[in-house]
Amino acid sequence: MKIMRKTHPLMKMVNHAFIDLPAPVNISGWWNFGSLIGLCLIIQIASGLFLAMHYTADTTTAFSSVAHICRDVNYGWLIRSMHANGASLFFVCLYLHIGRGIYYGSYLYKETWNVGILLLFMVMATAFMGYVLPWGQMSFWGATVITNLLSAIPYIGPDLVEWIWGGFSVDKATLTRFFAFHFILPFIIAAMAMVHLLFLHETGSNNPLGIPSNCDKIPFHPYYTFKDLLGVMILLGLYLTLVLFFPDLLGDPDNYMPANPLNTPPHIKPEWYFLFAYAILRSIPNKLGGVIALVLSILVLALFPLLHTSNQRSLTFRPISQFLFWILVSDLFILTWIGGQPVEPPFIMIGQVASILYFSIILILLPIAGLIENKILKW
């Protein structure tokens, strides 16, 4: 009898991707985050769908519709809390996934890496637009400040901003289109994630040693399905603890006030997962320069394959590069902290130094470290 999973056209695809997929024997827990991001995306789409059933994308009723979800809809408070905190967990998994890619040299799979960068931009855009939807104070002012940055683009900037707003300020048209985009983008992200996987399965997974593992592979199921399941259990434990015990820990209290165009909050800041980029934006006293630095802070990831100078793929046996990598991680924590602070001394200077260090490590120090390590190993 033929095995159905190996012959059925649809199941054959699933089989090649998740069951009979040859996987390196030595991949560690850092390889769990891909599946965890997938889980986060499923949770976000499911919870978002139920929220969209009760939400109204209108400036007069958006805020009260969110209050209605929390008060009157069965388990609405839970669905909203899951969706809001699910975004935070999504970004935690994303950043750890990217960090893993940098540490172990996974960026040398150029197609997979570039699709990943595109996915990151799409997830960031989706999260930003989602933050605008509750129409609280920080939603409104965050949308105003961030969309206004586009006015720094020479010549077309001001027209571009008005085109995105659908008027002369952030208003009903802006909210409606943001809701439409926020709804459709996750499905495009899911499709792009499939492309990401397609490219990955063309080459096979990398491993902690950064060496070819074709001679030593094991099937994905049952070994890595159960390993991923452990990651899922840990993630869900952390997730439910956050959702049920500390639902407002990562939110901004200002967003519990309805949007008021006549009253600016004392400190306008995005959600915690954008603070590092926000700090880089603010560290440059020129508007256009700040916007360029903001885009480059993410786009610089695309340069990793080009700036790889070492003869070894991963950082496992490269102590100088390891040291720089962890300095970079610390620097990102500092930038995240600075992004949430007011624009005053000493925070301005700390932010500027941290921003310079961020780009210096990636563009200058890591490539030099790779060359030095080659020399030390006489390669």
Curated annotation (Swiss-Prot):
Where along the chain is heme b b562 bound?
Answer: H83, H182
Task: Give the record's membrane topology.
Answer: Multi-pass membrane protein
Q: Quote the subcellular location field of this record.
A: Mitochondrion inner membrane
Binding annotation for heme b b566: H97, H196
One GO CC annotation, please? respiratory chain complex III
Keywords attached to this entry: Electron transport, Heme, Iron, Membrane, Metal-binding, Mitochondrion, Mitochondrion inner membrane, Respiratory chain, Transmembrane, Transmembrane helix, Transport, Ubiquinone
Instruction: Establish whether keyword Transmembrane helix is in the entry.
Output: yes
GO MF terms, alphabetically ordered: metal ion binding; ubiquinol-cytochrome-c reductase activity
* Residues annotated to bind a ubiquinone: H201
Q: Which domain of life is it from?
A: Eukaryota
List residues traversing the bilayer.
33-53, 77-98, 113-133, 178-198, 226-246, 288-308, 320-340, 347-367
Q: How is the cofactor bound?
A: Binds 2 heme b groups non-covalently.
Cofactors that this protein relies on: heme b
GO biological processes:
mitochondrial electron transport, ubiquinol to cytochrome c
Also noted in the record is:
Heme 1 (or BL or b562) is low-potential and absorbs at about 562 nm, and heme 2 (or BH or b566) is high-potential and absorbs at about 566 nm.
Give the family, as the similarity comment puts it: Belongs to the cytochrome b family.
- What binding partners and quaternary form does the record give? The cytochrome bc1 complex contains 11 subunits: 3 respiratory subunits (MT-CYB, CYC1 and UQCRFS1), 2 core proteins (UQCRC1 and UQCRC2) and 6 low-molecular weight proteins (UQCRH/QCR6, UQCRB/QCR7, UQCRQ/QCR8, UQCR10/QCR9, UQCR11/QCR10 and a cleavage product of UQCRFS1). This cytochrome bc1 complex then forms a dimer.
Please describe what this protein does: Component of the ubiquinol-cytochrome c reductase complex (complex III or cytochrome b-c1 complex) that is part of the mitochondrial respiratory chain. The b-c1 complex mediates electron transfer from ubiquinol to cytochrome c. Contributes to the generation of a proton gradient across the mitochondrial membrane that is then used for ATP synthesis.
The name this protein goes by in its record: Cytochrome b
| Natural source organism | Liomys spectabilis
Q: Which gene encodes it?
A: MT-CYB
